[in-house]
Amino acid sequence: MSETEAADAESGVETYEVAVVGGGPAGLSAGLYATRLGHDTVVIDRGGGRAAMMLDTHNVIGVTEDVSGNEFLSTASQQVEEYGGDVVRDLVTDIERTDDGRFRLGGNSTDVIADRVVLGVGFSDERPEPPLPRTGKGLHYCLHCDAYMFIDESVYVMGANEAAAHVAMIMLNFTDEVDILTRGDDIEWSDETQQLVEAHPVDVIHEDIVGMNKRDDGWLESFEFEDGTVREYKGGFPMYGSNYNTDLA
């Protein structure tokens, strides 16, 4: 045993060759590869994330669409563990370089040292103000994942920025019933984008949302607006940006 290994053992700190921060698809994939390559690996996951919100899994080869996000992540975690990796539930709050060039990761209950660190921490979507339907049942953040389910359905895109306008244009490939809901915010897109919006069958609704109605199965049925109108939608996409979890980088 080297002096470093002896010191680690004496301190009681767990040591690994690879520590992966983040237990979404990216982090678990990194953990699985590292473990199968023979590296002593730990995946530290705070929980939550986009994948955990999925009611059904789409666009993943070999995974049937009746698999929920939580089931998908659970299976991936089991795969890491079956090959000898550790999966720990904790929020990593600090990473610092040690004197010998390794990394010490601290969390609410975690204290580990690793030769290498992989950050798979993802990002968090900005949620609009309520009232809102349930995520996955009328409120959707991934256009590539969920646009297909709205073929020939009434769809909203929430926001007043360039992204909202361009997502509305994309949704016209799936349905001819697309509204942009600015919720009273000032338009931020360019004059060129305004011309694009005006040239397509998209309604821009400026009144804010004051109420919401759901169907018996929990899906969104309609929004109520401050001018008294009620508009029916199957679902839609809020476009308020994302916060990338880069604090540890």
Please provide the spans of the model-predicted regions.
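A Rossmann-like FAD-binding core segment of flavoenzymes
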Residues: V80-G106, D111-A114, T175-A249
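Conserved N-terminal glycine-rich FAD pyrophosphate-binding loop of Rossmann-like flavoproteins
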Residues: S2-E3, A9-T15, Y33, R46-N70, ...
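Glycine/Thr-rich phosphate-binding loops of Rossmann-like dinucleotide-binding domains
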Residues: R127-P128, H166, T246-D247
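Hydrophobic/aromatic ligand-binding patch that stacks against planar heteroaromatic rings
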Residues: S29, Y33-A34, V117, I170, ...
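FAD-binding core/adjacent interface of flavoenzyme oxidoreductases
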Residues: S2-V18, V87-E153, F237-M239
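Rossmann-like dinucleotide/flavin-binding elements
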Residues: E10-T41, C142-D186
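Helix-loop-beta segment of a Rossmann-like dinucleotide-binding subdomain
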Residues: M54-G69, R102-R104, D152, F174-R183
